């Protein structure tokens, strides 16, 4: 009986010791696993590129971004597409951003201390040595399916706006496409404020919103970029000349506060390649810089 009790006690001690060792191993394993996960997370974060780009680049730049990621394993890209004015404000307010691509020079200049015009002396967010003009777009006049008001051209639009026959969709004044539209209205000597008060103008916060207005026929015609019209399969009835609104040039640059400065430069160089250019040309952009 004593011998049996002794064996039982020895078995219990052995079992308890084994359980303790197993528990300790499990804890160590969990700690190792947590450390590994944490390390992987840090690695993932270290390879994340944040790109702020004009809304009109949504389709083409997203496609180019996929090509860049495929060629650079372990890299992730977070895109923020919106009006250039909104993006400029977000950068100014301290949002994380590695690369900025604007649909107009004005918004980029306002953030660039070395810009020759439009610069705000209190703002210095752009790494000027990385800046270049990447793309050119065109401003077009588009109409809904079947063109109910039979708007044939910018000339015709101006005539019908004057007589109050049509509702025009255009971007807000802080949006590049809206600023180009304002130049077109001035070219035709049209009073934007008067037309807006009379209910002949509908505004959009960015070019995608104006594109939607045309696509859904909530306006009779709209001024948007050629690339957005192409992507949305809208009918373009006219294209603005340089005399009417100037050239539509997109500048690109890395920011001074970029957390991924080297990766930002690498991405900007990639955008000059033939593979990236093909993505832009597909929707109507004209690449201005090629590697």
Which residues does each predicted region cover?
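N-terminal secretory signal peptides
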Residues: 1-7, 14-25
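Exported/periplasmic ABC-transporter solute-binding proteins
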Residues: 2-4, 29-70, 76, 85, ...
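Residue-level marker of structural boundaries
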Residues: 10, 21-22, 117, 190, ...
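Positively charged, low-complexity intrinsically disordered regions
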Residues: 10-11, 42
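Short, well-ordered coil loops that connect the C-terminus of an alpha-helix to the N-terminus
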Residues: 74-75, 97
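Short beta-strand-centered segments that line the small-molecule binding cleft or hinge
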Residues: 88, 94-122, 128-132
């Amino acid at each position: 009986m004593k011998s049996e009790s002794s064996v039982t006690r020895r078995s219990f001690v052995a079992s308890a010791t084994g359980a303790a060792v197993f528990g300790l191993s499990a804890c160590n394993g969990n700690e190792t696993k947590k450390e590994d996960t944490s390390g992987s997370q840090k690695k993932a974060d270290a390879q994340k590129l944040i790109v702020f780009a004009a809304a009109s680049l949504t389709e083409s730049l997203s496609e180019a971004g996929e090509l860049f990621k495929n060629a650079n394993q372990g890299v992730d890209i977070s895109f923020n597409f919106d009006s250039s004015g909104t993006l400029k404000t977000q950068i100014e307010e301290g949002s994380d951003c590695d690369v900025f691509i604007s649909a107009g020079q004005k918004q980029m200049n306002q953030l660039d201390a070395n810009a020759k015009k439009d610069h705000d002396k209190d703002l210095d967010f752009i790494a000027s040595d990385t800046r270049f003009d990447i793309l050119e777009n065109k401003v077009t006049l588009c109409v809904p399916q079947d063109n109910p008001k039979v708007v044939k051209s910018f000339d015709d639009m101006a005539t019908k706006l004057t007589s109050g026959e049509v509702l025009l969709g255009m971007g807000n004044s802080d949006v590049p496409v809206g600023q180009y539209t304002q130049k077109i209205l001035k070219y035709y000597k049209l009073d934007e404020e008067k037309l807006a008060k009379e209910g002949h103008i509908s505004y959009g916060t960015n070019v995608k919103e104006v594109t939607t207005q045309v696509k859904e026929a909530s306006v009779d015609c709209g001024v948007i970029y050629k690339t957005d019209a192409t992507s949305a399969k809208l009918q373009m009835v006219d294209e603005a000349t340089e005399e009417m609104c100037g050239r539509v040039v997109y500048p690109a640059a890395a920011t001074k506060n970029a957390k991924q400065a080297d990766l930002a430069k690498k991405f900007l160089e990639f955008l000059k390649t033939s593979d990236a250019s093909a993505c832009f040309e597909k929707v109507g952009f004209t690449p201005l810089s090629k590697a």
